[in-house]
Amino acid sequence: MKKLIAMLLAMVMVLGLAACGGNNAPAETTAPEAQAPAETQAPAETQAAAPAGEGRVYYLNFKPEADAAMQELAALYTEQTGVPVKVVTAASGTYSDTLTAEMAKSEAPTIYNIGNLSGLKDWDEYALDLTGTPLAGELTTNDFNLYNEAGELKAIGHCYESFGIITNKALLEKAGHSVDEIKDFASLKAVADDIHANAATLGFDAFSSSGLDGSSSWRFSGHLANMPLFYEFRDDSVTEQPAEIKGTYMDNFRQIWDLYITDTSADAKTLSTATNDESKAMFTEGKAVFYQNGTWEYAGLIDAGMKPEDLTMLPIYCGVEGEEKAALCSGTENCWAVNSQVSEADQKASLDFLYWLVTDEVAAQKMVDTLGALPFKAAPASSNVFLADGSKMIEDGKYVVSWAFNHTPNVDAWRATVVTALTAYSADPSDANWAEVEKAFVDGWAYEYNMANG
C-alpha cells in the first residue's frame, strides 16, 4: 500500500494533478436528479444524549455511496459531543449546482468538497486556510491537498481511489478463462468475444451495461475518456490544463467503447436511459463478468453478497503500445474545505468533526471501510481487494495511469457534449457518428476552455 501511495504522489507531481477532480462528482450514483438532496439531522433520539455542544456542522457530501456511512458517523458524533451534525448528499451529477445553491443560504454548508484547482479559483474566498490545523497535522502527505496562489492550504485531500475493470473471477473461470490471460486490449477482447459468443450457454455475458444516463455516464465521459487524455498528455508532457487537445488516441477510445457496447446483453440503442444501478446489478447478480468502476464500489459489492476472493480489478486496456505495463487509473478528487464565511464556532466545530473522523478508532475504521485508503496517521489498513490489486501492480513495476481528466475545462459541459455524441454513436456506430464523438471531444475541449478562460 505504501508503494501505491508513493507512486501516486510521484504521478501527481509529474503531471500536475495535485489534488481533486472536477466539480462533477464522478462517483455519484444515488438520489434522482429531480429530487432534493437527501438530508439527515443527527442524531436520532438517544437515552443518554450529550449536552449540546458549541457550533454546528453542515457537511455537504458529494459521494452518495458514502451517504449511509456519513449519516451514521454524524449521529454517533452528535451522541458523543452534543454538536449537531447535518449531512446532505447531492443528487447524482449535481454537486456543483447544489453547492452553489446551498452556499447562498443563511445556514450554508460548513464543510464541502472542492474538486480541483479550477474549483479552488471559484471557492477560494469561501475556503478557510487550514494550514497548521490539527487536521492538517494528521496527514501523512501534503501532495493531495489544494493550495491557492498565496500558498494557503485551502482543501485537504482525504482519500485516494483507483478505477478499472472490476472482474468476477469465478464467472471468468466458469467461462474457461483466467485473469492471467488478460494482459492488453487484444487479450481482453479475445476473452470478452468468447464469453459473448457463448452467453446463451453460459447464462451470463462479458460486460455489464455501459449506461449513459446521469447516474452512469461519468464512468465513460470522465473515467474511460481518461485513457486517451492520459496517453496524449504523457506523450506531450502536459503538466497543466491545455487550451486544446489533439485527440491522438481517439481510435483507442473507440476500440474499448465498441467492445463495451458489443460484448454485452445490454441494448446499445437504449443506453441513454440505462443507469449505473442497473449495470451494477448485472454484475452483482452474476449476469456479467466485467464492470467498469472504482475502488469505491468495493463495500457495495460485498454488501450485495459478492465474495472478496471472487473479485479483482484489471487495468483499462485500449490498444496502446506498452499497455501491458499499465496499472490502475489512480488519483483523488476528494478534498475537504471548511467554509470561511461561517462563524468561528461553526468553523471550530467542523474542524473538530473532521479531526474526529480520521483519528477516532471507530470513525476512522468506518471511513476506511467506506472510502478505501486514507492518508492520515491513525487510519487503519484497508481490506479493499481492489486497492491491494493496485499495490501489487506497483510492486510489479507497472506504471500508474493518473487522472488526466482533472484538467478538463468546464467539466460538466464538456462531458455532457461527449455523452450526447456517444449516445448517438452507440445507437448507430458509423464512422460519421464517431466523427461527431471526436468533434465533441477535441473541438469541445477548446470551446469549453475558451468559455472558462475568455
What are these regions (language model features)?
Residues 6, 20-119, 135, 272, ...:
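Conserved N-terminal structural module of periplasmic/extracytoplasmic solute-binding proteins
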Residues 50-51, 115-166, 219, 312-315:
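Hinge/lid segment of periplasmic solute-binding proteins
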Residues 60, 222, 231, 256-344:
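Extracytoplasmic/periplasmic substrate-binding proteins
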Residues 75, 80, 105, 175, ...:
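Extracytoplasmic/periplasmic substrate-recognition and gating elements
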Residues 76-141, 154, 170-176, 183, ...:
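Extracytoplasmic "Venus flytrap"/periplasmic binding protein-like
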Residues 154-158, 163, 189-242, 288:
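Extracytoplasmic/periplasmic solute-binding protein
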Residues 173, 197, 362, 395-454:
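Conserved C-terminal helix/tail region of periplasmic/extracytoplasmic solute-binding proteins
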Residues 192-193, 238-273:
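Glycine-centered hinge/linker elements that transmit conformational signals in sensory
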